[in-house]
């Protein structure tokens, strides 16, 4: 089956290219791969990953659905598994992939993103420098078990990471209608992690103060968007607070070009699929979680006010106001 799908893709690429251009040469330039790496993919020894499929699809206007076949029962997944030895490089590649996804979605007014989150979504915190840095610091701490841990204040992000974070925020904020279901204990879980690192003497008092202030700023922005029901650039924002906890984070992205489903695994890693059946199942699951949740955008004024006041109190109490 894998070789059959690979053959369909190669045939589609050949049909899309002028006769004088060789497939191998074109793919080497397009994907920035060496000759042998390209030939392994052409022969079917190695599968094209979803990022490569996305690049090929965009460059040659090839429909991946057509390549796979609408009636094909095979579900394709890609795992963004970030390893210790190339942590920042792989993190950057993941940001580039999703930034490109948002860039493609924003040209379609009907585009939408739905998510059920058991931790703070990227789009909520990535614009806050210390919070974004802490998430990466925590992941590096967890992955690099064989190396000494530097204090948070001495942990520096590469400039490329900072730049790509900003680009991700820019594209995701100007993209599409958003529905977010947030587990009610998300912030408490994050704060407990921050407090743990403080007890390890890896965070100092100033770090705690900075993170606290950014969290309060984030809550103020979320409350404002919840009241208006508007996400950033005048897109609809449906915000739910769940009364139960989720086992992981699920998201569903949709526009006329494609559907994309993602499931968070092992904290930082993501399993993603463009397979329509998987996407629809994920969408249905996310929507089913609304049964356990309370809509607080443009409604539920009392519940919303109590929720945000309680979150601010938790932040101040845990982080030693």
Locate each region found by the language model.
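Charged, low-complexity, helix/coiled-coil-prone segments
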Residues: 1-5, 32-39, 125-133, 148-164
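Generic detection of long, well-ordered alpha-helical segments
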Residues: 3, 17, 88, 205-212
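Hydrophobic protein-protein interaction segments
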Residues: 137-311
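Long, charge-rich alpha-helical interaction segments
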Residues: 314-321
């Amino acid at each position: 089956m894998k070789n059959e799908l690979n053959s369909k893709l190669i045939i589609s690429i050949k049909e899309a290219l002028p006769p004088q251009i060789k497939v191998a040469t074109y793919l080497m330039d397009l994907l920035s791969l060496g000759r042998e790496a390209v030939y392994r993919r052409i022969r079917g020894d190695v599968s094209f990953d979803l990022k490569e499929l996305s690049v090929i699809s965009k460059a040659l206007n090839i429909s991946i659905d057509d390549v796979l076949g609408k009636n094909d029962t095979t579900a394709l997944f890609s795992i963004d598994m970030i390893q210790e030895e190339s942590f920042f490089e792989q993190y950057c590649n993941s940001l580039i992939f999703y930034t490109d996804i948002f860039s493609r979605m924003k040209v379609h007014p009907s585009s939408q993103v739905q998510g059920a989150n058991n931790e703070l979504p990227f789009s909520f915190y990535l614009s806050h420098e210390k919070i974004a840095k802490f998430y990466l610091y925590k992941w590096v701490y967890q992955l690099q078990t064989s190396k000494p841990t530097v204090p948070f204040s001495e942990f520096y992000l590469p400039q490329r990471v900072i730049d790509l974070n900003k680009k991700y925020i820019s594209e995701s904020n100007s993209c599409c209608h958003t529905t977010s279901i947030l587990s009610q204990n998300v912030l408490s879980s994050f704060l407990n992690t921050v407090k743990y690192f403080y007890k390890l003497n890896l965070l100092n008092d100033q770090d705690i103060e900075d993170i606290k202030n950014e969290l309060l700023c984030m809550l103020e922005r979320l409350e404002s968007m919840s009241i208006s029901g508007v996400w950033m650039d005048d897109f609809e924002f449906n915000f739910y607070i769940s009364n139960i906890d989720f086992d992981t984070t699920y998201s569903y992205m949709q526009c006329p070009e494609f559907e994309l489903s993602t499931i968070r695994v092992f904290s930082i890693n993501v399993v993603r699929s463009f397979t329509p059946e998987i996407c629809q199942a994920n969408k249905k699951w996310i929507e089913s979680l609304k049964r356990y949740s309370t809509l607080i955008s443009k409604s539920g004024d009392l519940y919303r006010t109590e929720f945000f006041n309680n979150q601010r109190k938790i932040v101040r109490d845990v982080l030693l106001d």
